[in-house]
Amino acid sequence: MIVRTTAEITDTERDITSEDGNWRSKRIILGGDKVGFSFHETTIKAGSVNEFHYANHVEAVWLVEGTGKLIDLDNDKVYELGPGSMYLLNGHERHRVEPETEMRMLCVFNPPVTGREVHDENGVYPLIEVPA
């Protein structure tokens, strides 16, 4: 059994802030935990514009706090998000998140991230294998 709190991972190597300061991700479960997925609490700043493309991962996101827009860049669709909204990027969609207010979300990645990934110029995380 693994038990962790966000308080104990705050300001550790599991607490990642984007280079532009727009988002912060507390990576609660990572690939090294060997459970087949990773689990993060991510906060995105109000008024920011954030483009992502998880070409190597499926991501499920549940919005706990905040409001904003999710723009599906592959299908030209815009979704209004609020507390209780969920979106699943099961088609590796390129997308943009535009928070109207600060957004706090819980995210699950499969395959799991290791915690060392950095978005490249296209917003993509590389696929990093976790040793068995």
From Swiss-Prot:
Domain of life: Bacteria
Enzyme Commission number(s) of this protein: 4.2.1.108
Pathway(s) where this gene product acts: Amine and polyamine biosynthesis; ectoine biosynthesis; L-ectoine from L-aspartate 4-semialdehyde: step 3/3
Known catalytic reactions: (2S)-4-acetamido-2-aminobutanoate = L-ectoine + H2O
Any single biological process term in GO: ectoine biosynthetic process
GO-annotated molecular function: ectoine synthase activity
Keywords, in A-Z order: Lyase
InterPro entries cross-referenced by the UniProt entry: Ectoine_synth, RmlC-like_jellyroll, RmlC_Cupin_sf
Top-level EC class as recorded in UniProt: lyase
One Pfam family hit: Ectoine_synth
SUPFAM superfamilies: RmlC-like cupins (SSF51182)
HAMAP family: Ectoine_synth
Functional description taken from the UniProt entry: Catalyzes the circularization of gamma-N-acetyl-alpha,gamma-diaminobutyric acid (ADABA) to ectoine (1,4,5,6-tetrahydro-2-methyl-4-pyrimidine carboxylic acid), which is an excellent osmoprotectant.
Family, similarity comment: Belongs to the ectoine synthase family.
Protein name: L-ectoine synthase
Organism: Rhodococcus opacus (strain B4)
